[in-house]
Amino acid sequence: MAEQGKQGGKVPFGPDYVRAISPYIAGKPISEVAREFGLDEAGIVKLASNENPLGMPESAKHAAAAAIAELGRYPDSNGFELKAALSTKLGVPQDWLTLGNGSNDILELAAHALVTPGQSIVYAEYSFAVYALATQEIGARAIVVKARDYGHDLDAMAAAITSDTRLVFIANPNNPTGTFVPAAALETFLAKVPAEVVVVLDEAYNEYLDDDQQYDSVAWVRRYPNLLVSRTFSKAYGLAGLRIGYAVAQPELTDLLNRIRQPFNVNSVAQAAAVAALGDTAFLQRSAELNRAGKAQLVEAFSRLGLEFVASSGNFVLVRVGDDDDAGARVNVALLRQGVIVRPVGNYGMPRWLRVTIGLPDENAAFIAALERALK
């Protein structure tokens, strides 16, 4: 029973900074929308969670199926096979790698390992919700830097770093806006950051970059001991339901993350599927090509409808659907009633916008038709 306070009321459990957290709200699953609106699941289009519309590669399905036979045993806590595959692909030693239960796990591990209550974490306005969550859950102070053109203002972020800052989060491409920071600007920023401040470069959508945007962040890890690159298998690799990501950093950082991560944080099916997906370059190329075509399909429709949108380097597009602060919620409900799930972003301070995942051509077409009806 909770301790009674002097005035007879219960003393609340937990610290104030934990009770102040707004729980993360994920995109609605298809089954929930079907129940809520009386729809057939088979006809619902989900473009809310930036998943790969191709699903899992066949190679990963076969590897996952084979791994099921050993589910009576604990997974390899150190993830040797996956680390070996990543080590070969990236050209780094295995002790430069940490595996996570999705890249969300990596982001939170970094905050817990590197920041103490009262110290500060810097991140941009309109950036991934987990940055704020990771900051709040450890009692750190958030320094939120105003966005520039819906993306990162790196000069302002460098200037915002204080003597108690220990972590900076940067997503490239950024979620939910899709903006991209060129390599030269990132390198300039890294050179400005004090040695005691760790930069987490969140590259969840890295595989969707066009050829002229590609850069080698792993090479930067070799030069900057305070850089940690975070990546995931949830997006382009199609393994969102298996929850697996990884960090690349020098051993001084990965050692800290490995000290506090759960011993078996990545299950054996996820590890096996990730090894297979990592080697399936044909699937990755097909995913990127499909994404480029789908992005063009959405952009053409938004332009035709006279809707403002943010040029995206990810597998989603942010579109403004009205001029009033109820626009995003209103249009979202109208889409749900038609069996189309997208992501409202009012929780990011963008109530007039919706984020739309790029789907298969027929899914994109269904969304466009539903959007036109919703806007009438």
Curated annotation (Swiss-Prot):
Keywords on record: Amino-acid biosynthesis, Aminotransferase, Histidine biosynthesis, Pyridoxal phosphate, Transferase
Top-level taxon of origin: Bacteria
Pathway: Amino-acid biosynthesis; L-histidine biosynthesis; L-histidine from 5-phospho-alpha-D-ribose 1-diphosphate: step 7/9
One GO-annotated biological process of the protein: L-histidine biosynthetic process
Molecular function in Gene Ontology: histidinol-phosphate transaminase activity; pyridoxal phosphate binding
The protein's Enzyme Commission number: 2.6.1.9
Alphabetized InterPro entries for the sequence: Aminotrans_II_pyridoxalP_BS, Aminotransferase_I/II_large, HisP_aminotrans, HistidinolP_aminotransfase, PyrdxlP-dep_Trfase, PyrdxlP-dep_Trfase_major, PyrdxlP-dep_Trfase_small
Post-translational modification N6-(pyridoxal phosphate)lysine, affected residues: 235
Cofactors, names only: pyridoxal 5'-phosphate
Catalysed reactions, semicolon-separated: L-histidinol phosphate + 2-oxoglutarate = 3-(imidazol-4-yl)-2-oxopropyl phosphate + L-glutamate
Oligomeric and partner information: Homodimer.
NCBIfam families attached to this UniProt entry: hisC
HAMAP family from the UniProt entry: HisC_aminotrans_2
Similarity section: Belongs to the class-II pyridoxal-phosphate-dependent aminotransferase family. Histidinol-phosphate aminotransferase subfamily.
Protein name: Histidinol-phosphate aminotransferase 1
Gene: hisC1
